[in-house]
């Protein structure tokens, strides 16, 4: 079954990678300041789409690249990879990797690529994944409680909920869903699974709905819990941290990073990474160093873009989207590389911290 997918912020994302004078709100480039040599980059550059999905952003970028350019696309989703391979079969510039963007550095190195001209990431869940009940992402459609981006490996949400403690569930839901009723939700899930296994999305949604005492306007009470479980089961924030670090390591001078995020946890990580790399001297402000001894910016922020009213009217998913863009300077990488500018989340497999006395989920 085919599901429609409309890429969010399509034109500004591609513009961010190819236009030398691109600048969104808050861009640090001054008017008239020259950008990178766009003609050379478009004809011979190497670009990365870390979240191929159904290929909307990739196709739009390919339409503006030259015949000698290369585009390496990544995705965990087997259905997305099938679409990507069809595209690659008809366009020799495209190379396909079945894997997440966290493996970007290793996969590019294996292909002899040491430097790239652009990296784009469209974070979150695609419309086809949400609309397909069998994937288990939606609390509005009944389906298996799965939520894996890559359905060929790893535990499902149902697997994890069947064995997680109340404390583990509480912390995941509080940290990754920013749910203030996380403790109540965790206890409700434990009570529900004691009477019958939780195998479907609607079972979980009904269980959670009874524990969330107030509703945010226009938001289903299970929204934050589903978000938290999806992020946790796919290790989304840990993988984003690795991808951002790899992008800083791989981008050549003038290369661009364009990231679309859909919730505050992702956007905060992207924003903080760009800010840290653009203003590394801030971390040394209290040290008795001469200006010449301070670290120089690794990137220049090119600002952010949000969807206009026209796009939001035609695609509700665009309402929460934020595109942030950065341009690599010619400054050499510091010891430790790009990882030093990224605040990583939970390490995959790290034990969940226990509940503090009296804690019932934290407000954020």
Swiss-Prot record:
Cite the InterPro entries for this sequence.
RsmH, SAM-dep_MeTrfase_MraW_recog, SAM-dependent_MTases_sf
Chain sites annotated for binding S-adenosyl-L-methionine: 55-57, 75, 101, 122, 129
The record's subcellular locations are: Cytoplasm
Q: Which GO terms describe its cellular component?
A: cytoplasm
Catalyses which reaction(s): cytidine(1402) in 16S rRNA + S-adenosyl-L-methionine = N(4)-methylcytidine(1402) in 16S rRNA + S-adenosyl-L-homocysteine + H(+)
Keyword hit for Phosphoprotein: no
Enzyme class name: transferase
The record's EC number reads 2.1.1.199
Enumerate the residue ranges of region (Disordered). Answer: 333-364
Share an example GO biological-process annotation for this protein.
rRNA base methylation
Q: Is NAD tagged as a keyword? A: no
Molecular functions per Gene Ontology = rRNA (cytosine-N4-)-methyltransferase activity
What Pfam families does this protein map onto?
Answer: Methyltransf_5
| Gene3D superfamilies registered for this protein in UniProt | Putative methyltransferase TM0872, insert domain (1.10.150.170), Vaccinia Virus protein VP39 (3.40.50.150)
The cross-references to SUPFAM superfamilies, in alphabetical order and at most eight, read: Putative methyltransferase TM0872, insert domain, S-adenosyl-L-methionine-dependent methyltransferases
Recite the UniProt keywords alphabetically: Cytoplasm, Methyltransferase, rRNA processing, S-adenosyl-L-methionine, Transferase
* Task performed by this protein: Specifically methylates the N4 position of cytidine in position 1402 (C1402) of 16S rRNA.
Q: Which family does it belong to?
A: Belongs to the methyltransferase superfamily. RsmH family.
Report the protein name in the record. Answer: Ribosomal RNA small subunit methyltransferase H
Question: What organism, scientifically named, is this protein from?
Answer: Bordetella pertussis (strain Tohama I / ATCC BAA-589 / NCTC 13251)
| Gene (name only) | rsmH
């Amino acid at each position: 079954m085919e599901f429609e997918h409309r890429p969010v912020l399509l034109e500004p994302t591609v513009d961010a990678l190819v236009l030398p004078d691109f600048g969104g709100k808050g861009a640090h480039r001054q008017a008239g300041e020259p950008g990178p040599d766009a003609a050379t980059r478009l004809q011979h550059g190497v670009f990365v789409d870390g979240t191929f999905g159904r290929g909307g952003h990739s196709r739009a970028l390919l339409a503006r690249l030259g015949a000698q350019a290369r585009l390496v696309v990544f995705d965990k989703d087997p259905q997305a990879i099938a679409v990507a391979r069809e595209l690659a079969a008809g366009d020799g510039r495209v190379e396909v990797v079945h894997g997440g963007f966290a493996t970007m550095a290793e996969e590019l190195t294996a292909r002899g690529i040491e430097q790239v001209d652009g990296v784009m990431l469209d974070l979150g869940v695609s419309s086809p994944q949400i609309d397909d009940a069998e994937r288990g992402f939606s609390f509005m459609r009944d389906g298996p409680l799965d939520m894996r981006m890559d359905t060929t490996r790893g535990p499902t949400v149902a697997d994890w909920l069947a064995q997680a403690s109340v404390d583990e569930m509480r912390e995941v839901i509080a940290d990754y869903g920013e749910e203030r009723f996380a403790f109540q939700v965790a206890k409700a899930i434990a009570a529900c699974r004691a009477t019958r296994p939780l195998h479907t999305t609607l079972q979980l949604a009904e269980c959670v709905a009874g524990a969330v005492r107030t509703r945010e306007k226009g938001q289903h009470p299970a929204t934050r819990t589903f978000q938290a479980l999806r992020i946790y089961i796919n290790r989304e924030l840990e993988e984003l941290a690795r991808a951002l670090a790899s992008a800083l390591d791989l981008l050549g001078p003038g290369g661009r990073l364009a990231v679309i995020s859909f919730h505050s946890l992702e956007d905060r990580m992207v924003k903080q990474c760009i800010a840290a790399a653009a203003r590394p001297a801030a971390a040394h402000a209290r040290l008795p160093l001469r200006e010449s001894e301070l670290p120089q910016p690794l990137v220049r922020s090119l600002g952010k873009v949000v969807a206009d009213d026209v796009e939001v009217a035609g695609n509700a998913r665009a309402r929460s989207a934020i595109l942030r863009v950065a341009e690599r300077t010619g400054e050499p990488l510091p010891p430790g590389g790009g990882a030093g500018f990224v605040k990583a989340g939970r390490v995959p497999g790290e034990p969940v911290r226990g509940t503090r006395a009296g804690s019932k989920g934290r407000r954020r």
